[in-house]
Swiss-Prot record:
Domain of life, source organism: Eukaryota
GO BP, sorted A to Z: methylation; mitochondrial respiratory chain complex I assembly
Keyword terms of this UniProt record: Methyltransferase, Mitochondrion, Transferase
Pfam families: Methyltransf_28 (PF02636)
Compartments (UniProt record): Mitochondrion
Reactions mediated catalytically: L-arginyl-[protein] + 2 S-adenosyl-L-methionine = N(omega),N(omega)'-dimethyl-L-arginyl-[protein] + 2 S-adenosyl-L-homocysteine + 2 H(+)
The protein's name: Protein arginine methyltransferase NDUFAF7 homolog, mitochondrial
GO molecular function: protein-arginine omega-N symmetric methyltransferase activity
Chief localisation class: mitochondrion
InterPro entries named in the record: NDUFAF7 (IPR003788), NDUFAF7_sf (IPR038375), SAM-dependent_MTases_sf (IPR029063)
Enzyme Commission code: 2.1.1.320
A GO cellular component entry from the record: mitochondrion
Family: Belongs to the NDUFAF7 family.
């Protein structure tokens, strides 16, 4: 989206959003109507929009988008929000990620300073647990870098990770700088491009699934893109393009076109951009990455775009800006974009990944120090959720520079992936 288009979008949304500019803590029950009115008016004036544009607007539009709401009291994560993430369930998840990061870092042979980058940190629960795990190894060379587009969430993350709050910086690549409770330098950025050069470890949990997707449907021998349009009554609805367009011709790979069993497909070019940015970094300056998300290896043959409100699946078009929009990550598609430049492991089921890291052993240790039976039961329940349905739906996907390929092969793969050959060999 060009800067000019972004400015037009922001100015238009401000026009519709005047009524919700209230003092902090005030949450207008009508705030989503402003976004819906904007979308309806936009479609009436300029025509149908892609699912990707609809998703991006609903998620990140200033003031009225899901993560761009004015109110800092918006409940998104956890039991009182719309969805719960693995780090919110139990400290076990973040601790295992922290152990994995340190273990793989040690096996690269890297010495000296390094950067730990998290994409889309949410309320910073994952980073909190990762740093607690790293502290046990007495690592003094790490600095933390968080990529976050929501100012309200940046405030939440700083409150969680730091003792004192700070002010936004001007004329610096980072937008905020502070120290964590354990004295680690921490920085916030709006874009991966602003992170300093250097050896970097990237982590992300439920980040890629929130990025915009394009949806396609096959009719006969032709592929059509799915758009968001209006019914005769002025309600939002889905429709198919009349024929092939620039997106069907430019995004759908020949492997999908040649698959006679395929009638639907979806992809996220924005996710592809993020993954390529990660690969550019780790192949140039050293490092590796671990992304955990809803996803599949490319074999899914149905659309996955959906919305969640209060932990229940709802209509994706009914309340734009009020529900969490998500789509399964096609790790197979992403792997094809970078397989010539990096060594890829996964996607592995989350429960397999965590089991190989020894999460059950860590569970037993934590149960021994629980205060009472109720705390033990809560821990066991969280563990079962992490390793049960969530453990099947979520996948772990790791990227390493090809310079580490021989070492990784000698080890039988990185921790958590020893039971599965790397993607580049499939």
């Amino acid at each position: 989206m060009s800067l000019r288009v972004q400015n037009i979008l922001i100015n238009s949304l401000r026009q519709y959003s005047k009524q919700i500019l209230k003092p902090p803590g005030y949450a207008s029950p009508e705030k989503t109507n402003h976004l819906k009115k904007f979308l309806v008016d936009k479609i009436r004036v300029s025509g149908p929009i892609t699912v990707a544009e609809y998703m991006k607007t609903c998620v990140s539009a200033p003031l009225v988008g899901y993560y761009g709401q004015f109110s800092k009291d918006q409940k998104v994560f956890g039991a009182k929000g719309d969805f719960i993430t693995s780090p919110e369930l139990t400290q076990l998840f973040g601790e295992m990620i922290g152990v994995w990061v340190f273990h793989e870092l040690a096996n690269t042979g890297h010495k000296g300073s390094w950067q730990l980058v998290e994409l889309g940190p949410g309320r910073a629960q994952l980073m909190n647990d990762v740093l607690n795990a790293l502290a046990k190894f007495n690592d003094k060379d790490v600095s933390v870098h968080l990529v976050e587009t929501s100012d309200a969430l940046i405030d939440e993350q700083e409150k969680s990770l730091c003792i004192y709050t700070s002010k936004n910086s001007i004329d610096t690549p980072f937008i905020r700088k502070n120290k964590t409770r354990t004295g680690v330098n921490i920085y916030w950025y709006k874009s991966i491009d602003d992170i300093p050069d250097g050896f970097t470890v990237f982590i992300g949990n439920e980040f890629l699934d929130a990025l915009p997707i394009h949806q396609f449907h096959k009719s006969g021998d032709s592929w059509n893109e799915v758009y968001v349009n209006l019914t005769k009554d002025g309600d939002l609805c889905f429709m198919k393009s009349k024929g092939e367009n620039l997106h069907t011709k430019g995004l759908i790979p020949s492997a999908i076109r040649d698959d006679s069993s395929r009638v639907t497909w979806e992809c996220s070019p924005e996710s592809g951009t993020v993954v390529n940015q990660i690969v550019d970094r780790i192949t140039t300056f050293g490092g590796f990455s671990l992304l955990v998300d809803y996803g599949h290896d490319g074999s899914r043959n149905t659309h996955s775009f959906r919305a969640y409100k209060n932990h229940k699946q709802v209509d994706t078009l009914e309340n734009p800006g009020l529900a969490d929009l998500t789509a399964d990550v096609d790790f197979g598609y992403l792997s094809t974009l970078v397989k010539d430049r990096v060594v890829i492991y996964g996607p592995n089921e989350q429960r397999e990944f965590l089991a190989q890291l020894g999460i059950e052993h860590r569970l037993r240790r934590l149960l021994q120090v629980c205060k009472d039976r109720k705390q033990q039961e809560q821990l066991i329940e969280s563990y079962n959720m992490l390793m049960g349905d969530m453990g099947l739906k979520f996948k772990a996907w790791a990227l390493f520079p090809k310079t580490l390929e021989f070492i990784l092969e000698q080890r039988g793969g990185p921790a958590g992936f020893s039971a599965k050959k790397k993607t580049t060999e499939n």
